[in-house]
Amino acid sequence: MNVLSEKINDYLSTPSSCNFFQKLVILGTMIFIISGLNLIGDNDYVFSQVNASSPPPSPSNNSQQTQESLGSTNRDAILSYEQGNKFLNAKNYDQALISYKNAITFDPNWAAPLIKQGNTYFELANYTTAIKSYDKAFAVLGNLDEKVKSIDKNNGPKPYWLDIWFDKGEALTNLKKFDDAIALYDKLISLDPNWANPWNSIGWALQKQGKNDEAVTAFDNATKLNPSWAKPWNSKGWALYKTGKFDEALSSFDKAISLEPKWDKPWFNKGKIFYDLDKYPDAKQFVEHALSLKADPKTSALLENINAKTESTTTVE
């Protein structure tokens, strides 16, 4: 028997001094109220959407809180922010920026739209402006260095602002401010020693400076922490290739391919090594496969060079 039936049955079976008409009025009121309560219970998602200022954190390997967990009590800010997220996911960056700007105007003390604004500028390769947005978010959040002291490095959820530091480091790397970027990555590693991403980014920053031996060490650390992640295996292979360690490089590329066989980069890199070793048939095989996965001018140019070398070798013979 549901709640409504129970209440009606209790009412009808209880002696009362009310006349029949009064009972009908009271009974109708009870039905209206209880039905309303049932509707609220059956549709509690409506309430949760209205109060969407603090959605639950998305699951991740290190249980970090999402940026949205910063929260806001301003409904207009929340709606503009959510609209911005939809535009960002659709890669409609101009509209995303407008929405995030509106959210910031509605609630200037909410860091989440500042962070996403920075991420949008990052996608547009406007790294300087992205960093300005991240720094404004830091200003809203307060002194994070003080909050660092309360972080449990091995257990429990990690704070959302670790991601902001990482994003700022990536922007600094793209601006070739490698020392500043590596300093941020080092700080992240000290806070979360089990996170592979900063090690991979350190390797990339070192590689950009031609410090390939040091880069190999950084990529090694990334692969140890996340052995199923193809990117550091591929990057390690390229750093090894740059130091002339072709066999080790090929082994790293093979590992990347085994983890992500439809990714064109390690296939291209294998082809480049065989091209440099004058093994043109092997080089052609891998480069053609890379092209079948993704059309790329750089890959097409390498294939043309391989074909030219093959024709030249055939003519000489």
Predicted regions and their residues:
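Register position in tetratricopeptide repeats
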Residues: 89, 123-124, 174, 208, ...
